[in-house]
Amino acid sequence: MDFSLVKELREKTGVGLVKCKEALLEAKGDLEEAIVVLRKAGALSAAKRSDRITGEGYIGLAENESGLALVELNCETDFVAKTATFTEFANRLAQVTLEGRVSSVEELSQLSFPESSAISIEGERSSLVQKTGENIQIRRVLFFPKKAGHSYGVYPHLGNRAVGVVALLCSGQERLAKELAVHVVAFAPKFLSEKDVPQDILRQERDIGLCQAKEKPQAIAEKIAEGKVRDFLAQVCFLHQRSMSEPKLSVSEWIKREEKQTNASISVASFFCWRLLGE
């Protein structure tokens, strides 16, 4: 198959590459006939919807002993986003991502569900567009491998509009990891600790403090600037934030208390939060 023909058909119709290739194969390389094939399949009407805004959706989630997978599936309305057909499709996408350790939307789109191997996932997506009458797009995918000696916590929130994930460097701490994942969703930390914050950001916060205290004596202004930086770190750093479960303790202090109670060494290996339409 001449890829330039596939590309030309894609540019003319707006239909995905996989569907274009299938249409050209059926049309034996005839471009105009391939367009007719796409029209008969309803793919063109689906493509016409592809420029409509997708401001709703659902984050599909799948997990096993080797890893976890997330897939953000977008649609136009919350009505469709809450339907079983839509959420099940997102979770099936996540399961394929998990089993295949998929790393991109493009790779996922060319795969198939095990129960319908004759149809690509891109074809299934187009069918769902036809069924719902909405623009439906796979926005992003992630496969997150698990490591030995770690504990993992996953927390889906607000109908899977947000999913928090925490990995702890310590086995047998799934409960704590889950509680910390809830915290990540609620407080949205950007960094693990002070050492992870870029120096230019810290300097900027300090300069803001000095500017706000410019009428004060230098020694007092310096203390105000230091306080400004501490407050900033308490807002954006995971370990510096107040614990959601124990507000009197920072997350770091909370983890240390768990270490004493379990006689284990616990540290945060990684964390992240996916939010619908987020980065």
Where on the chain are the PLM-derived regions?
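N-terminal assembly/interaction segments in proteins that build large macromolecular machines
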Residues: M1-E279
